[in-house]
């Protein structure tokens, strides 16, 4: 067993060896290294064929038309293109956007930018389990609402939003619906023929593909128009200029093809691991699972251990690669804004740890983790005067602390 054990699959996945093998074939002189936009010779034609094949593999995962797939540098760029691109194209119709407080920064920050440009954005509060109340969403919709952006699966707590129902509400009012599916594409079924979703952001590296490549699904019927954010050679039907990275695109296509083929197997494997981990730590008293446990992807377990500082716990678990808060914001010591939005107090939000596992995680690694967590939590609580007070039955919320 290799240490430290990797439990941060929601931040990124290792590239599947089958994917890496396909990618290497698109790099060197004796491989398929051409520019897909070079239409005058065989090197370009072969590269274009590989890109078209990958486009089909990605479309296949969504049950979409390959012409609806636009390649980008990742889900962050896809989110920016979808949100700013749609808002700017349709701004004559209205300047109101709806999103949720627990979205990824790649959605919240473009929305903040739109606010600076004169748009109005409504940030919905989720319920305590992380799920959005559809009545609240419906109440927030207005005549001038042009876009709703809601993520499919949350990166910190793994809860699954009811995208199908939200899509129905949006379509009935002719509002464009964007979904950030970075954490769900390849993990749970996504069918654009069944779901009324107009724009979907995807990333390769959350599904055992390479980093630096993603895609945006742009619906053709009814046709969705976007204002390009990247200008140049007019690649990707004008949506996103820039030479296509054949090796990365081939990697993404292969990763999504494998994800489709192994989806049930991967799902069952992750669920068994999560149940094993939760069973091993849930009797540690004052343990809270953050986010709904049923409406959730099995690859994620976000737990708060009361009276234990998250940073101290991470340091004590040096043989486990886990995260406190999400990777994109965990450089700061601020408590997770996602957990705060669920109504957790600062202490519980600070004491949260996200375990995320995947295709290459083993039962042996889970058992090792359980033993490490139990030792670390008990040791840190033994050092905590607050834990002693809690054990003595003192309600800490009623204690008046002296300010120095």
UniProtKB/Swiss-Prot annotation:
Annotated catalysed reactions: (sulfur carrier)-H + L-cysteine = (sulfur carrier)-SH + L-alanine
Entry keyword set: 2Fe-2S, Cytoplasm, Iron, Iron-sulfur, Metal-binding, Pyridoxal phosphate, Transferase
Pathway noted in the entry: Cofactor biosynthesis; iron-sulfur cluster biosynthesis
InterPro entries (alphabetical): Aminotrans_V_dom, Aminotrans_V_PyrdxlP_BS, Cys_deSase_IscS, Cysteine_dSase, PyrdxlP-dep_Trfase, PyrdxlP-dep_Trfase_major, PyrdxlP-dep_Trfase_small
CC annotations in GO: L-cysteine desulfurase complex
Biological role stated in the UniProt entry: Master enzyme that delivers sulfur to a number of partners involved in Fe-S cluster assembly, tRNA modification or cofactor biosynthesis. Catalyzes the removal of elemental sulfur atoms from cysteine to produce alanine. Functions as a sulfur delivery protein for Fe-S cluster synthesis onto IscU, an Fe-S scaffold assembly protein, as well as other S acceptor proteins.
Any coiled-coil regions, as ranges: none
Positions that bind pyridoxal 5'-phosphate: 75-76, 155, 183, 203-205, 243
Assembly mode: Homodimer. Forms a heterotetramer with IscU, interacts with other sulfur acceptors.
Gene: iscS
Enzyme class, UniProt record, top EC level: transferase
Annotated source species: Vibrio atlanticus (strain LGP32) (Vibrio splendidus (strain Mel32))
A single MF term (Gene Ontology): pyridoxal phosphate binding
Record family assignment: Belongs to the class-V pyridoxal-phosphate-dependent aminotransferase family. NifS/IscS subfamily.
Name of the protein in question: Cysteine desulfurase IscS
Subcellular location: Cytoplasm
EC number: 2.8.1.7
Residues at which [2Fe-2S] cluster binds: 328
The keyword Iron appears for this protein: yes
HAMAP family linked to this entry: Cys_desulf_IscS
GO BP terms: [2Fe-2S] cluster assembly
């Amino acid at each position: 067993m290799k240490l430290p054990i990797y439990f941060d699959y929601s931040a990124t996945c290792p590239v599947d060896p089958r994917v890496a093998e396909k990618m290497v074939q698109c790099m060197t002189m004796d491989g398929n290294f051409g520019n897909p936009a070079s239409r005058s010779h065989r090197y370009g034609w072969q590269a274009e064929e590989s890109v078209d094949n990958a486009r089909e593999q990605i479309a296949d995962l969504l049950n979409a038309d390959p012409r609806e797939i636009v390649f980008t540098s990742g889900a962050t760029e896809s989110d920016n293109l979808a949100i700013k691109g749609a808002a700017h194209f349709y701004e004559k119709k209205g300047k109101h956007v709806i999103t949720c407080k627990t979205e990824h920064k790649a959605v919240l920050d473009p929305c903040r930018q739109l606010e600076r440009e004169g748009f109005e954005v409504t940030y919905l509060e989720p319920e305590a389990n992380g799920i959005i109340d559809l009545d609240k969403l419906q109440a927030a919709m207005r005549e001038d609402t042009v876009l709703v952006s809601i993520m499919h699966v949350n990166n910190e707590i793994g809860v699954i939003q009811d995208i199908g129902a939200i899509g129905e509400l949006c379509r009935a009012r002719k509002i464009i619906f964007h979904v950030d599916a970075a954490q769900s594409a390849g993990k749970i079924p996504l069918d654009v023929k069944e779901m009324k979703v107009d724009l979907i952001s995807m990333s390769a590296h959350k599904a055992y593909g390479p980093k630096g490549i993603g895609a945006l699904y742009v619906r053709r019927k009814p046709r969705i128009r976007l204002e390009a954010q990247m200008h140049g050679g007019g690649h990707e039907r004008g949506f996103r200029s820039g030479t296509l990275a054949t090796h990365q695109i081939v990697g993404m296509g292969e990763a999504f093809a494998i994800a489709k083929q192994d989806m049930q197997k991967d799902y069952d494997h992750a669920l068994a691991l999560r149940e094993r981990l939760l069973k091993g730590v849930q009797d540690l008293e004052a343990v809270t699972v953050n986010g709904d446990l049923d409406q959730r992807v099995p690859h994620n377990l976000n737990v708060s251990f009361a009276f234990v500082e998250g940073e101290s716990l991470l340091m004590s678990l040096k043989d486990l690669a886990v995260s406190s808060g999400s990777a994109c914001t965990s450089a700061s010591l601020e408590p997770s804004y996602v957990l705060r939005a669920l109504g957790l107090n600062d202490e519980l939000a600070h004491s949260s740890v996200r375990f995320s596992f995947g295709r290459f995680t083993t039962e042996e690694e889970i058992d090792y983790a359980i033993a490490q967590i139990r030792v670390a939590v008990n040791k840190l609580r033994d050092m905590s005067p607050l834990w002693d007070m809690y054990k003595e039955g003192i309600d800490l919320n009623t204690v008046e602390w002296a300010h120095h």
